[in-house]
Amino acid sequence: MNSVIWDKYIHLLNEIQFEDFDFIVAIGNGGIIPAAFIQKKLNIPMKIIKINYRDPSHKPKYDDAVLLEEKDFPIKNKKILLVDDVSRTGKTLKKAKEYLNGNTIKTFTINGEGDYSFYNQEECLLMPWTSISHN
């Protein structure tokens, strides 16, 4: 498992030229920290939606991604940057796009396929924030 260190992450993020967006939507939990960094860079509002597909050991937990908070998304007709840390199967991003329909959506992932992405490799990456130990 490779490690993505903070300095490298910040460097890669600073090199991306994002188009204009109205909102950032982070997929919780994995997309929250990357989205917070992007929000700082773009200075636009951020929302969080909870979608889950995998367990903490990254094994599929459900047959399909599951929206954990069922409610109407109040934003329509906007340009949204949808952020997750990893996209392997695309199921989580697909579920989020269905939930956010009525908006123009681009995706960002640290690892995996996205409109914006640092890496697209099969091997799991250890994100800097995952090194924080639990008490």
Regions found by a protein language model. Give the residues of each.
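Substrate/cofactor-recognition hotspot
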Residues: 85
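Short glycine-rich phosphate-binding loop at a beta-alpha junction
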Residues: 20-29
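Active-site-facing substrate-recognition patch
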Residues: 1-20, 71
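Short, highly selective alpha-helical patches that border small-molecule cofactor pockets
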Residues: 31-35, 39, 93
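Structural motif
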Residues: 23, 79-81
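Short, glycine/charge-rich flexible loops or terminal/linker lids adjacent to PRPP-binding catalytic cores
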Residues: 9-10, 44-79, 88-98
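Alpha-helix capping/helix-boundary segments
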Residues: 30-31, 88
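PRPP-dependent phosphoribosyltransferase catalytic core
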Residues: 44, 49, 97-135
